[in-house]
Structures are given as structure tokens and as C-alpha cells.
Regions:
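A hydrophobic/aromatic-rich effector-binding and dimerization subdomain
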Residues: 1-16, 57, 61-126, 139-148
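Localized chelating/binding microdomains
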Residues: 30, 167, 186
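Generic protein-terminus/edge-of-domain signal
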Residues: 1-56, 63, 70-71
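Short helix-capping/hinge SLiMs at alpha-helix to coil transitions
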Residues: 169-173
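All-alpha amphipathic helical-bundle segments outside canonical DNA-binding/catalytic cores
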Residues: 123-137, 154-157
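N-terminal positioning helix adjacent to the helix-turn-helix/winged-helix DNA-binding module
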Residues: 109, 155-163, 199
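Basic/polar phosphate-binding segments, predominantly the helix-turn-helix DNA-binding elements
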Residues: 146, 174-205
């Protein structure tokens, strides 16, 4: 596992592609994934959620997640990433809340949502105004179908999750291994070993 933190700006990225294993990572963008063929597993914390064609998954900003492909055959999905700027009035709630169950099953998704996602895929990315308007429709139709809880309740209480969450929360600050270990209530030697062996990060002490 390698920690990846992407600092997105004023951008919406949408692509339909073959699904593959994606290691645990996080970013400050909203991520929406819609399975278009086959199946996909969305991992949030220690939970793994099975998705099939038509299911839509929502990963709010700064939530650790990963993807796995366990189903044989052709598995494809539309992946949409939207920076905090582009999610407008939904930005504040997404900073503090997250879906308790991040999947909306296909039978609960309105046909309009699929049409709008396809429209985002077909929009020229040079003009963000149109895809941003489409995104608001997707969120307006879908957010109400998700049970939102405090973001701290989503994921895992294990040390790996706490460490990645700490790094993401303090991503733009300078902090030492000793400071992080103290804040997490563990030995710096235990923490250093975890970061090196599990996250594959060379932490400068």
C-alpha cells in the first residue's frame, strides 16, 4: 500500500475506463464511480462494498478508499472526480460528513442521473461551467439517498487508518514523527515501522 494524496484545484475529471485494482489513497476531491459493465468492489476503511452495473458509489473528500476487481470478464466504470470548488453548496457538508453506506443501488438511481453523467463525459473540459451544472444535478438527485454520518465514524479505528488520516489532515503542515506518535498515542518506533513497512513511506525524523 502506498499513500497518495492528490490536491485537486478547480477541475472536474470524468473518464470511462476498464476497472482495476487501485491501492488505498485519498484526496480532497469528491469521487463518484458508476459501474457500466461487470462489477467492482469499493473499499472504504476496512469495509468492502460490492458494486454491479448501474450502481453508483460516492467517496467524499479526505476519505481513504480503494478499488478491487474480483469478477472475471470485462469490468468498466465511469470515474468522476470533482474538486471542492465545483461541488458548490455541497462542499461544507462533505467536509464534515460522509455516507454510512456509500453505494446507491441501480434500482434506486433515477434515469436522469445516468444521462447527466454521460453528458459530463461528453462535455469539453475547457469550460467547467457546464459540467459543474451537471454535477449539481447528480448531487441533488443522489445525496438525499445517502445516510450521512460524522466523517470520523466512517472507516476504521486501526492504527493504519489513523496514521493516514493524520497525514492527510496535516498534509500542508510540517510535523515530526515524534509529534505524530504523541498525538496518536503510540511509540515513534512502532509508528516508524508501520509507515515504512505498510505505507511504504520514508518518513524523515
Amino acid at each position: 500500500m502506498q499513500l497518495k494524496y492528490v490536491d485537486t484545484k478547480e477541475v472536474i475529471i470524468a473518464v470511462n475506463k476498464k476497472s482495476k485494482h487501485i491501492e488505498p489513497h485519498l484526496h480532497n476531491a469528491l469521487e463518484i464511480v458508476c459501474v457500466t459493465n461487470g462489477a467492482l468492489e469499493l473499499g472504504v476503511g476496512q469495509e468492502l462494498y460490492h458494486m454491479e452495473k448501474g450502481d453508483i458509489g460516492f467517496v467524499f473528500p479526505d476519505v481513504i478508499h480503494h478499488y478491487q476487481v474480483l469478477t472475471p470478464g470485462v469490468n468498466k466504470a465511469t470515474y468522476l472526480m470533482a474538486s471542492p470548488f465545483t461541488i458548490a453548496k455541497f462542499a461544507d457538508i462533505m467536509q464534515s460528513m460522509a455516507p454510512e453506506y456509500p453505494i446507491i443501488k441501480a434500482e434506486k438511481v433515477e434515469p436522469e442521473v445516468y444521462r447527466v453523467i454521460n453528458a459530463i463525459l461528453e462535455t469539453e473540459q475547457s469550460d467547467i461551467t457546464v459540467p459543474q451544472a451537471y454535477l449539481q444535478i447528480v448531487l441533488a438527485r443522489c445525496i438525499g439517498k445517502l445516510n450521512l454520518v460524522e466523517k470520523s465514524n466512517v472507516g476504521s479505528n486501526d492504527l493504519i487508518y489513523q496514521t493516514v488520516s493524520y497525514i492527510s489532515a496535516n498534509f500542508k503542515k510540517k510535523f515530526s514523527l515524534e509529534e505524530m506518535a504523541k498525538d496518536l498515542g503510540v511509540s515513534k518506533y512502532v509508528l516508524n515501522s508501520l509507515i515504512s513497512k505498510t505505507l511504504h513511506i520514508n518518513f524523515k525524523q
